[in-house]
Amino acid sequence: MYKRQLNNFNKLDSFGVLKYLINTDNYVENSFGLRFQHAALINTDNRLKASKSVTPGFLIAALLWPKLIDASKDKGSLNLRKFFRSMDRIIREQQVLTAVPRKFHGYIKDIWSLQLKLETRLGHQPYKILNHPRFRAAYDFLLLREEAARDSQGMGAWWTEFQKVNRPGKIELLKLLRESRSGPVEKKFGFLEELS
């Protein structure tokens, strides 16, 4: 595991400079927010080392995600109205500290809003999501969230499988998912540890 970005992040924090670049005031040691940001930094390093593409928009989305979650929490779930209203505000507040190029605003908000759609997995929605231009970034983001939240619901594994299988396999996965949900679908978003 390559950790150059994480080491730089930790050095900036130890020198007291990080708070001037990104607001980490209410992060406690070993909190979801810090684990998620660390996972994103390590992921970025691993992608660079493997000569895979990286975009600053993805990393900015990851660094700001804990702040968006904090602004959107409501009784153990996300308040969707707060979630969508907070997106622009979070980016605007970050711009007071560091520049976030306008071309990344839409990219960041797409990744964030796709997190809700990736969690829903109803009807024809998964097929539409697969064709979204930001699907791959949103999927990678979901895997990082799942890792940082220490979640074992298998949502990331489900999406991994859904990408691999052919059309009949996709239909079967959706059928199994539908059968596993008894009664009406509860619209609760976010991983438990992410929301605590």
Region spans (language model):
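Arginine-glycine-rich low-complexity intrinsically disordered regions
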Residues: L177-S196
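Conserved, hydrophobic alpha-helical core segments of structured domains
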Residues: K3-L174
